[in-house]
Amino acid sequence: MPVLGSQRRLLGSLNCTPPATFPLTLAPNRTGPQCLEVSIPDGLFLSLGLVSLVENVLVVAAIAKNRNLHSPMYYFICCLAVSDLLVSVSNVLETAVMLLLEAGALAARAAVVQQLDNVIDMLICGSMVSSLCFLGAIAVDRYISIFYALRYHSVVTLPRAWRIIAAIWVASILTSLLFITYYNHTVVLLCLVGFFIAMLALMAVLYVHMLARACQHARGIARLQKRQRPIHQGFGLKGAATLTILLGVFFLCWGPFFLHLSLIVLCPQHPTCGCIFKNFNLFLALIICNAIVDPLIYAFRSQELRKTLQEVLQCSW
């Protein structure tokens, strides 16, 4: 993974140093003022990864169990859960191997650890790209269902959805291979950052347009019922709150990581950028948090899926 400063790499575990005692430390910069560095304990990484792992496994199991959920929209949600699942698995695996190496319970040559590190980095990169793609696919699917409701089932068909899903996974695998092979090339980093900005812009435009259409529809109903102001204001506030949460979580969880990549290109030697580089572990933790929040936003709000989830949990007991 192309990072500067503090980073979670397996090779660093071969010559490990004791972890910081406090979660917040002021890290001195050689050419500038002190920096605030947030140290993320390995136990927290494991806990976040395991919570995300359980959540997303439940989403996949619920969608697989209920045939009523075998539709393009839920297939996109299922693939998002698989992507988040891979993010969690890769980080849990990396943390576990690092802990075993540091404790001396696992002996491995540097070359073997390097290969394992590359595999995990490919898994992380591919799952990140696929997660962003499926977030965009879900936004497009919802947009079509609102603005082209009568034509939705002819536009978003199962064969077309499967082709989109296959294309996303193939593109994610190819992207991860290119990223690991050419991570030290500026163009590769800029393409990843540009991809994130494009997904953010796509989601913002589509969801804002959907909110505007929903408010317009609510105003029409209010005029018929002669209660325009209360209904419109209440619906508008609820829709704006939902939109803020959806886009806010996306930006807060993914933004710092891609800011990190941008600064590697723009100011790799600047003291202020160096302060940001030191918090790379925090940025990874935020991405895992996004994998925890995604099921709450996209999956568990469905009554049908929640009902199926209860059945899955009852069967497991």
Curated annotation (Swiss-Prot):
Matches recorded under Gene3D superfamilies: Rhodopsin 7-helix transmembrane proteins
Domain of life (superkingdom): Eukaryota
Primary localization class, coarse: membrane
Glycosylated residues (UniProt): N29
S-palmitoyl cysteine lipid modification positions: C315
Protein's UniProt keywords contain Membrane: yes
Keyword Membrane: yes
Cytoplasmic face residues: 64-72, 141-163, 212-240, 301-317
Pfam family, one: 7tm_1
Bilayer disposition of the protein: Multi-pass membrane protein
Swiss-Prot/TrEMBL keywords: Cell membrane, G-protein coupled receptor, Glycoprotein, Lipoprotein, Membrane, Palmitate, Receptor, Transducer, Transmembrane, Transmembrane helix
Compartments where found: Cell membrane
Family: Belongs to the G-protein coupled receptor 1 family.
Functional description taken from the UniProt entry: Receptor for MSH (alpha, beta and gamma) and ACTH. The activity of this receptor is mediated by G proteins which activate adenylate cyclase. Mediates melanogenesis, the production of eumelanin (black/brown) and phaeomelanin (red/yellow), via regulation of cAMP signaling in melanocytes.
Assembly: Interacts with MGRN1, but does not undergo MGRN1-mediated ubiquitination; this interaction competes with GNAS-binding and thus inhibits agonist-induced cAMP production. Interacts with OPN3; the interaction results in a decrease in MC1R-mediated cAMP signaling and ultimately a decrease in melanin production in melanocytes.
Name listed for the protein in its UniProt record: Melanocyte-stimulating hormone receptor
Annotated source species: Capreolus capreolus
Gene that this polypeptide is encoded by: MC1R
